[in-house]
Curated annotation (Swiss-Prot):
Pfam families found in the cross-reference section: CPSase_sm_chain, GATase
HAMAP family per record: CPSase_S_chain
Entry similarity comment: Belongs to the CarA family.
Record gene name: carA
Protein name per the record: Carbamoyl phosphate synthase small chain
Functional summary from the UniProt entry: Small subunit of the glutamine-dependent carbamoyl phosphate synthetase (CPSase). CPSase catalyzes the formation of carbamoyl phosphate from the ammonia moiety of glutamine, carbonate, and phosphate donated by ATP, constituting the first step of 2 biosynthetic pathways, one leading to arginine and/or urea and the other to pyrimidine nucleotides. The small subunit (glutamine amidotransferase) binds and cleaves glutamine to supply the large subunit with the substrate ammonia.
A GO term from the CC aspect: cytoplasm
């Protein structure tokens, strides 16, 4: 028999439904994601640390879960909110139902609530703190108190929390339908050595770099510039990640060193914001952020529109860009800055997720541009 669950927002709004995960209490910033597929990749994206994810598509869990689609070693979202959980997970790759997957990692979840109403609240009032309570003895007053106690993501440095604790090599390319996940490539197939800062890196980002000939050394978020330079990299990659970029002073300072050395730098998501801060721009907390796989972004250089995958609650402030930074991409939803390029250094970044997972690959050529900068650096 299904257990009950409730979601309480900091403004006092209460949603009652059924539990689809573990028993317990979870608190975080409640956000909504408009992706129709890719729920497992979303849950395991470290960028969702300290966030409760609401999926707007009504049927979630149809294809179950499997070990190959995880973007990290664990679920990083604080909780999951959906409209309907199908009774049967049907897919030839399925290994476990979504409900069992949540329970196995002690993640709370709630279903059978009005996710359209919840999304409208978040869109109109902005992202709110919330509390999911699942199991017996549900207490609305306690849930509301816990939601109000949560400090919010502003000023929170989560990159160093979710980052790897030890450096490691990554040489595995992308999954294919015919062969699944491939074996690690030989060094002879990977001519470019790239150091990737792990602020919460998704595996598919690393795979797409390997696809383009990069031998990766993935390092912890707080690795010094001196330690990275000792590895003699051909380029430095700044990964995605959760939380506020401004407290990540260690990463901002290291990036400034790489810029001074004219080493190619490519940033995604949090890495984009780190490059902006290192170059003298400022960042802002967004009202409800961008979370989804259907966001139109205009490439200002080529004059074309890309459909992109997005997941961020902070953004670089275009009004603060110094003269040596030019805007390269803008959101067609709200006009926010989506990409920048240094005019005096081989460095650029993109706010969205060109690796998708889930989502379209319209922005994948950004990886190719990074390789072009590396080739010029090595020439």
């Amino acid at each position: 028999m299904s257990k009950s669950a409730l979601l309480v927002l900091e403004d006092g709004t209460v949603f009652r439904g059924v539990s689809i995960g573990a028993d317990g209490i979870s608190v975080g910033e409640v956000v909504f994601n408009t992706s129709m597929t890719g729920y497992q990749e979303i849950l395991t994206d470290p960028s969702y640390s300290q966030q409760i994810v609401t999926l707007t598509y009504p049927h979630i869990g149809n294809t179950g879960t499997n070990s190959e689609d995880e973007e990290s070693t664990a679920i990083h979202a604080q909780g999951l909110v959906i409209r309907d959980l199908p009774l049967i997970a049907s897919n030839f790759r399925s290994e476990q139902s979504l409900s069992d997957y949540l329970k196995s990692q002690n993640i709370v979840g709630i279903a059978d609530i009005d996710t359209r109403k919840l999304t409208r609240i978040l869109r109109e009032k902005g992202a709110q703190n919330g509390c999911i309570m699942a199991g017996d003895n549900l207490d609305e007053a306690l849930a509301l108190a816990k939601a109000k106690e949560f400090p919010g993501l502003k000023g929170m440095d989560l990159a160093k929390v979710v980052s790897t604790k030890e450096a490691y090599a990554w040489k595995q390319g992308s999954w294919t339908l015919e062969g699944g996940l491939p074996e690690a490539k030989a060094d002879s197939e990977l001519p470019y050595h790239v150091v990737a800062y792990d602020f919460g890196a998704k595996r598919n980002i690393l795979r797409m770099l390997v696809d383009r000939g990069c031998r990766l050394t993935v390092v912890p978020a707080q690795t010094s510039a001196e330690d990275v330079l000792a590895l003699n990299p051909d380029g430095v990659f700044l990964s995605n990640g959760p939380g506020d970029p401004e407290p990540c002073t260690y990463a901002i300072e290291a990036t400034r060193v790489f810029l001074e050395k004219n080493i190619p730098v490519f940033g995604i998501c949090l890495g984009h914001q780190i490059l902006a801060l290192a170059s003298g721009a400022k960042t802002v907390k967004m009202k409800f952020g961008h979370h989804g796989a259907n966001h139109p972004v205009k490439d200002l250089d080529r004059g074309v529109v890309m459909i992109t995958s997005q997941n961020h609650g902070f953004a670089a402030d275009e009004a603060t860009l110094p003269d040596n930074l030019r805007a390269t991409h803008k959101s067609l939803f709200d006009g926010s800055l989506q990409g920048i390029h240094r005019t005096d250094k081989p460095a650029f970044s993109f706010q969205g997720h060109p690796e998708a997972s889930p989502g379209p690959h319209d922005a994948a050529p950004l990886f190719d541009h990074f390789i072009e900068l590396i080739k010029q650096f090595r020439a």
